[in-house]
């Protein structure tokens, strides 16, 4: 997918949002436990997960393996990521909000952090500080709140996957768009050509 390919990006976002909305049909118990999982394509048990697992599972449904993408980028650029261990760990690194923030800023688009709800589009990823430096992540979906008129968020804050009007409920710390590895490879080539 070329960076300027608007229709391909629009279709990708549409499919990604559909996958995120579908996640609300699953019963998921909030469980942040460290679990050894296969690589690539590994996942914690389907009935467990945290906020990051909702993002991971939505992307996986459209053919993007964030476990692999994050791990591969961390292997090459470990110093760019927050340090929790001495080396990348494919079992857990993609399940950490701080790592996803770095990954999406490196491989996707970093967008303005604003309280203007109209700046957030379906498929956008939003991160928050829930207070006490507790991070959270969710995805903007194409359903609007009847009360506020804002696009709502698919996320798991401890009650399983839900769609709720929570965009402005906490301090926003990140706003991203990520269209998969083909998009970031194209963007990287474009950046290299512009640098010449």
Regions found by a protein language model. Give the residues of each.
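N-terminal capping segments
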Residues: 1-104
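Generic detector of low-complexity/intrinsically disordered segments
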Residues: 3, 127, 194-195
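...with weaker cross-activation on analogous glycine-rich loops/strands in unrelated enzymes
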Residues: 12, 17, 75-154
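Residue-level marker of positions within ordered structural domains that often coincide
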Residues: 25, 59-60, 143, 158, ...
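Residues in flexible loops and secondary-structure boundaries
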Residues: 38, 42, 74, 78, ...
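Generic alpha-helical propensity signal that fires on short helical segments
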Residues: 38, 82-84, 144-146, 158, ...
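A structural signal for short, hydrophobic beta-strand segments that form beta-sheets
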Residues: 66-67, 140, 171-174
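Low-complexity, Gly/Ser/Thr/Pro-rich intrinsically disordered linker/tail segments
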Residues: 148-196
